[in-house]
Amino acid sequence: MRAWLLLLAVLATFQTIVRVASTEDISQRFIAAIAPVAAEIPLASASGSGSGPGRSGSRSGGASTSTALAKAFNPFSEPASFSDSDKSHRSKTNKKPSKSDANRQFNEVHKPRTGQLENSKNKSKQLVNKPNHNNHNKMAVKEQRSHHKKSHHHRSHQPKQASASTESHQSSSIESIFVEEPTLVLDREVASINVPANAKAIIAEQGPSTYSKEALIKDKLKPDPSTLVEIEKSLLSLFNMKRPPKIDRSKIIIPEPMKKLYAEIMGHELDSVNIPKPGLLTKSANTVRSFTHKDSKIDDRFPHHHRFRLHFDVKSIPADEKLKAAELQLTRDALSPQVVASRSSANRTRYQVLVYDITRVGVRGQREPSYLLLDTKTVRLNSTDTVSLDVQPAVDRWLASPQRNYGLLVEVRTVRSLKPAPHHHVRLRRSADEAHERWQHKQPLLFTYTDDGRHKARSIRDVSGGEGGGKGGRNKRQPRRPTRRKNHDDTCRRHSLYVDFSDVGWDDWIVAPLGYDAYYCHGKCPFPLADHFNSTNHAVVQTLVNNMNPGKVPKACCVPTQLDSVAMLYLNDQSTVVLKNYQEMTVVGCGCR
C-alpha cells in the first residue's frame, strides 16, 4: 500500500512539472524510466496482502520498490537532461524516441564519466596485478568474499526487466563502479599487514591453505644474538674460562687413552664426580689433561732410541687446581717372533724402563746434571701394553717453579746387565722414516689429574637424600618399592631439555659430547603427596598446611632431587686435550620439596 501511495505522489508531482514545461517528450521519458518499477509493484503488493506474515512481506516489498525507484532516478542509470537542440528536433518530428536513440544519447551525456571510470578501472587493475608476495594470500581470501558479497547485493537490488539495452548498459556501468572501487580499498588495507618474511617460501611451495604457525617453526629456531652472548657467558663461567679457545681442530689428534677414559666414565654409573684410574690415587680429581712432548734443539743431544729427554709444558693448569696424580704413558711396538725367540732367557726377554726428574741442568766442563729417580717398570718383549710411570713429584715441582721445568729423562735397559736395550721396543722418539700421523698415535703422553675445588664434598648419592629424615633418604642404587603411579602430565616429573653446543658455535673445540640432555623438573605437587614424589617430611607438612590455609604458606615446589655429572672432552687455548667431569649438570630425579 505504501508503494502505491508513493507512486501516486510521484505521478502528481510529475503532472505539475508537465503543466509547467508543456512538453510531451519529458513525460514519455519518465514513463519509460519507471516502467521497470511498475512491473514489480503488483508482485510487491501481492506479497503484502493479507494479515500475519503477509504484513512483513508488504514491508519488504515496499523497501524493494523504494530501492528500485531510487535506482531509477540515479544519475548513473538515467540521463538527467537533454540539450535544447535535441528537444527542438523531437518537437518538430513529433516521434517517440526509440531505445537505440536513448542508448546513444545516454552514452554521449555520460561519456566523460565513463572515461573516468575506465581510468579508475585501469589503475585498479594495475594495483591488483602488481605482485605483492607478502599480501597475496590474504588478498585472495578477502577478494573472494568481497566479490561474492557484492554480487549478491547487486542481484538483490537489480530491477527486473524484460529486455532493454539501456538498462543492460547502465547495469554494466554500475557493476564496474561497485566492483572495481572496493578492490582499491582492499589493496590499501592488505598493504598494511606484515607477513613474516619466511612465510613467502612456504606460501609459494604449499599454497595458502597450509600457511600456519606450525609451518613457520618447522625449521630450528635460533636464539637472537643477545641471548647467545648471555648463554656463552654462563657456559664460560661454568667451564672456568674467560673466552672460548680459537684452535684448528684438524691439526689435533685426540689420544686414544683419553677416548677410552671418556668412554669408561660415560659407560659406568659413578657415585661422585671423581675420575677413577687404576693404580693411581685420583680421589676427588675431576679434570684430566694430556700433554705432548715439545720439540727443541736439545733433542739432538739424545740420538739413541733407548735414552731420551721429554719436555712437557704444564703452564695451562690453573693455579687454583690441586694436582692429585700425574703419569707418563709410553707405547710399545710389537717385536717379531724371531726376535723374541732368540732371547730365550727370561732375563733377556725383559726390559726395565726408568724415568728421572731432571732437577738441575749440567754445564759442560763445570758440572754434571742432577737426576731424581721417580719410577721404574719392568716390561716383557712379547707384550705391547702401554707403560705407565708415576711422575707426580716432578709435576708438583714444575707447578711450584715453572722456570725449573727441565723435563724428564727416560731410559730403557736390560734387566740383568743394565745395558741399553738393543731393540726399538719402547717408543721414546720418532724414527727418521716414520710418518707424522703415525707418530702422533705413538708419541709419549703426560696425563695430569687435578681437582678444581668447585664440586661439593658430598657425592651424588648424598644429594638424593636431601634433608635428613625425609622420604628421599634412599640412595640412587637402592631399589625402590614398586608403586602404582597414575599418568598425570601436570604433576611433578622430569622433562627433556637438550643443550646443543653448536647453538653457540662451540662444536669446533668441544670434542664430546656435542650436546647433552640436562632435563628439568616441572609440575604440580598435589595434596596428599604420594610416595613417588620423593618428598621430605618438611614438604609433607608444608603441603598439609597449604591445603588447610592456602593463603598462609605456598605449595611444595617441584625441584631436582638427584643430579648427576657430565664428562666433557674438549681442547683449550694451548691445544691441550682436557677431560673434565662437571658436577650437577643433568637431572636424574624430581620431587616435591
Swiss-Prot record:
Q: Per the record, GO CC terms?
A: extracellular space
Q: Where is the composition biased (Low complexity)?
A: 56-70, 161-174
What residues does the annotated propeptide cover?
Answer: 16-461
The answer on whether this UniProt entry bears the keyword Cell inner membrane reads no
- The entry's keywords: Developmental protein, Differentiation, Disulfide bond, Glycoprotein, Growth factor, Secreted, Signal
Cystine residue pairs: C492-C558, C521-C590, C525-C592
The family database entries (Gene3D superfamilies) matched by this protein are listed as: 2.60.120.970, Cystine-knot cytokines
Positions with biased composition (Basic and acidic residues): 98-111
Tell me which tissues or organs this protein is expressed in. Expressed in the imaginal discs associated with establishment of the proximal-distal axis of the appendages, and midgut mesoderm.
Predominant location category: secreted
Q: Which family does it belong to?
A: Belongs to the TGF-beta family.
**What role is this protein assigned?**
Acts as an extracellular morphogen to establish at least two cellular response thresholds within the dorsal half of the drosophila embryo. Required for the proper development of the embryonic dorsal hypoderm, for viability of larvae and for cell viability of the epithelial cells in the imaginal disks. Acts together with scw.
PANTHER family per UniProt: PROTEIN DECAPENTAPLEGIC, TGF-BETA FAMILY
Q: Subunit structure of this entry?
A: Heterodimers of scw/dpp are the active subunit, dpp/dpp homodimers elicit a basal response and scw/scw homodimers alone are ineffective in specifying a dorsal pattern.
Q: What is the name of this protein? A: Protein decapentaplegic
Q: Whose protein is this, by species? A: Drosophila simulans
Q: What is the lineage of its organism?
A: Eukaryota, Metazoa, Ecdysozoa, Arthropoda, Hexapoda
